């Protein structure tokens, strides 16, 4: 029916994306599609013996296009014209360094084959040392415990540890990076045409649990706290974000295509 409305959900897992088309009024599943990340499937950009797991942003884009097209092809005629929303969930923390436009560095020719310019997958454990330093800083006597709302222990799987590890390891990425984006925030920014890193809407769930964001201390930890971990983090707080939004808030509008 022409007045039937639909939404599309995309679940980005470790190996693949699942697209789901749902009828808004009834919650009925109309069609699904699963597509595997092509580069990841080949084992590219990862070093298992080092617990180094990276994913290319092109993998995310290509499976987005393929899964949505296939799912819609399985729906009744006219469904695509009546899609009124899309939503994403992803594994985390899976951050990537971006330029001022919010583009992951791996999308640039000079970084296309550099794993440090790609998304650092949730299960990447290369930042064990950095996580230990964060825990030590947060738990020393008299310090504000910025891990208090994250279970009291900061993990090497999380945002700040991974960011600091890459900054220390890769001068080229360090020099080219303007900001950092979480996978769950980049996908909505991508499909809504966001062209500025500062305009990317940040999800409260990932920010609160992985990035030590909390209203109690005004958002992210203060710059002086970050810089005390390593001067390489100087300036990052202002280039990241202050506010976050909950999952019930729209971040933009769908383009016609």
Identify the residue ranges that each predicted region occupies.
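N-terminal glycine/serine-rich phosphate-binding loop of ATP-dependent small-molecule kinases
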Residues: 1-108, 234-243
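Gly/Ser/Thr-rich active-site cleft segment
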Residues: 12-14, 136, 140-257
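Short loop segments at secondary-structure junctions
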Residues: 25, 100-101, 125, 169-171
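A short acidic, often aromatic-flanked loop/helix-cap motif at beta-alpha or helix-coil junctions
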Residues: 40-41, 128-129, 250-252
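Generic structural "secondary-structure junction" signal
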Residues: 42, 100, 123, 213-215, ...
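Active-site phosphate-binding/coordination module
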Residues: 44, 77-160
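Short, well-ordered alpha-helical packing segments
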Residues: 61, 65-72, 120, 131-135, ...
């Amino acid at each position: 029916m022409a007045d039937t409305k639909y939404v599309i959900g995309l679940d980005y897992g470790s190996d693949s994306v699942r697209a789901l088309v749902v009828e808004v009024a009834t919650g009925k599943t109309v069609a699904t599609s699963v597509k595997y990340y092509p580069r990841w499937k080949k084992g590219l950009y990862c070093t298992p013996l080092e617990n180094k797991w990276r994913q290319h942003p092109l993998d995310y884009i290509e499976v987005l296009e393929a899964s949505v097209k296939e799912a819609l092809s399985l729906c009744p005629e006219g469904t695509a014209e009546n899609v009124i929303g899309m939503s994403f969930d992803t594994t985390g923390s899976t951050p990537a360094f971006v330029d001022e436009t919010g583009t992951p560095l791996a999308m640039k020719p000079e970084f296309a084959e550099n794993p440090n310019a790609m998304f650092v997958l949730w299960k990447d454990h290369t930042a064990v040392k950095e996580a230990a330093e964060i825990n030590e800083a947060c738990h020393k006597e008299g310090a504000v415990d910025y891990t208090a709302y994250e279970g009291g222990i900061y993990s090497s799987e999380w945002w700040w540890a991974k960011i600091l590890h890459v900054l220390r390891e890769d001068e080229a990425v360090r020099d080219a990076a303007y900001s950092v984006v979480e996978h769950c925030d980049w996908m909505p920014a991508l499909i809504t045409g966001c062209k500025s890193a500062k305009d990317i809407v940040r999800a409260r769930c990932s920010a609160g649990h992985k990035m030590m964001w909390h209203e109690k201390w005004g958002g992210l930890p203060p710059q002086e706290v970050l810089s005390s971990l390593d001067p390489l983090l100087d300036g990052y707080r202002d280039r990241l974000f202050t506010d976050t939004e909950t999952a019930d808030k729209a971040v933009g509008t769908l383009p016609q295509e």
